[in-house]
């Protein structure tokens, strides 16, 4: 629906703090977007759309809501990719509409170094709003945005749990109110991620009858300090119960 924060092309309701003449851009014609989404939904295709700025997210949620009302109830699992900057009033709408927030926690500790310069101290409070979304009963799932960001889910969990920016200037976490627990981050990368792609019956948890895809880590993530998560390494990887990687 829009661009990115760093390029000032993410679409916001209010202008950028450092560029008061600019509020970003919507990259899609909204009427066309609704038509495309509605047609795809009628073919039972799952819809996932990029939205970063608060205007873009609001516009996409409005479009999703219109399509849901027009096409009737069913198990859609519409997704918003990024859901990065949200209007406070839109946070509860994800759960109300059964829309999944698909987010990339690494970006929080990267953008956190400079985001406030671009959008000011108020709007950052609902930037990468992991905890607010979970508290509103949203299905939150995590990914990497690779190759734009590192692919490692371990580093992503570190980012979600600590929110310590890459410049080490926020030891208590950038917007610490939005930090989540390790268990919540694990669910976002596993169980809920599988649900978000209609794969919960075959993966996401280790259960009889599901794919035996798993890793063995150097440390128990639940037994170490959150600051040490980023140092954890993969000792072995299994796909379908067969070892496909071993760290020698």
Regions found by a protein language model. Give the residues of each.
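His/Asp/Glu-enriched, well-ordered alpha-helical/loop segment
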Residues: 38-47, 55-78, 82-83, 88-92, ...
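Metal-coordinating catalytic core of metallo-dependent amide/deamination hydrolases
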Residues: 1-54, 58, 62, 93-100, ...
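Extracellular/periplasmic ectodomains of large secreted or surface enzymes and adhesion receptors
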Residues: 247-248
């Amino acid at each position: 629906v829009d661009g990115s924060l760093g390029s000032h092309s993410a679409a916001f309701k209010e202008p950028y703090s450092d560029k008061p003449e600019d509020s970003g851009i919507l990259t899609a014609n909204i009427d066309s977007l609704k038509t495309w989404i509605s047609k795809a939904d009628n073919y039972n295709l799952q819809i996932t759309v990029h939205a970063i700025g608060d205007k873009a997210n609001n516009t996409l949620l409005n479009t999703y809501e219109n399509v849901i009302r027009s096409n009737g109830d069913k198990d859609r699992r519409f997704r918003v990719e990024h859901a990065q900057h949200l209007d406070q009033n839109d946070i509860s709408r994800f759960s109300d509409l059964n829309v999944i927030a698909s987010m990339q926690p690494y970006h929080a500790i990267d953008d956190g170094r400079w985001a406030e310069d671009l959008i000011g101290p108020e709007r950052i409070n609902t930037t990468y709003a992991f905890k607010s979304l979970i508290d509103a009963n949203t299905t939150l799932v995590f990914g990497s945005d690779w190759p734009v960001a590192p692919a490692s889910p371990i580093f992503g969990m570190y980012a979600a749990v600590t929110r310590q920016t890459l410049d080490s200037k926020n030891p208590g976490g950038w917007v610490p109110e939005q930090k989540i627990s390790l268990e919540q981050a694990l669910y976002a990368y596993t169980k809920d991620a599988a649900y978000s792609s209609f794969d919960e019956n075959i993966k996401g948890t280790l259960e009889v009858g599901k794919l035996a895809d798993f890793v063995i880590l150097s440390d128990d993530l639940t037994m170490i300090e959150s600051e040490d998560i980023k140092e954890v390494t993969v000792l072995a990887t299994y796909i379908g119960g067969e070892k496909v990687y071993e760290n020698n």
